[in-house]
Amino acid sequence: MTIRYFSLGRFAMREAFSLIGVGAGDLVMLPSYICRDVLASVNERGAKPIFYDVDSNLQPKFLDPETKSKAIIAVNYFGFPQNLEEFEKYARSCGSVIVEDNAHGLLSRDENGNLLGQRTDFGITSFRKTIRTPD
């Protein structure tokens, strides 16, 4: 596992998209409830955001395997882990790369004790969202 440090989560997201090779015209799946900086990172690459709905527990309602995205963002809202089973199933079906956005979950773990932000192809965790740090 390689760990890189960035001053802001948006810079980490940009780097993840760069390493994945997200470019003009590529599809990136995002939850309909998302930070504008994540959306900006998609738009900066010239990629097309595709939104999936989340339920009242902020879990994905439906990930359409017919929509072939280059990357899919799984957000651990407020440090609560996403159930990655649906994301992994989707990624296997179309070759998509999962980015785990754990900006609000510093040191949070899932029910198996795994650190959030380290369970997928790419993970992003932010000190700034949990511990006030300057820009």
Which positions does each model-derived feature cover?
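Short loop-beta-helix segment that forms the pyridoxal 5′-phosphate
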Residues: M1-A16, L30-P31, Y52-D53
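Conserved beta-strand scaffold positions in the cores of enzyme catalytic domains, especially
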Residues: I3-Y5, P49-F51, I98, G123-I124
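Aromatic-acidic/polar surface patches that form glycan- and anion
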Residues: Y5-F6, F80, T130
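Conserved glycosyltransferase catalytic-site signature
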Residues: R10, P134-D135
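PLP-dependent aminotransferase-like
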Residues: S18-L107
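Conserved active-site segment immediately N-terminal to the catalytic lysine
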Residues: E100-P134
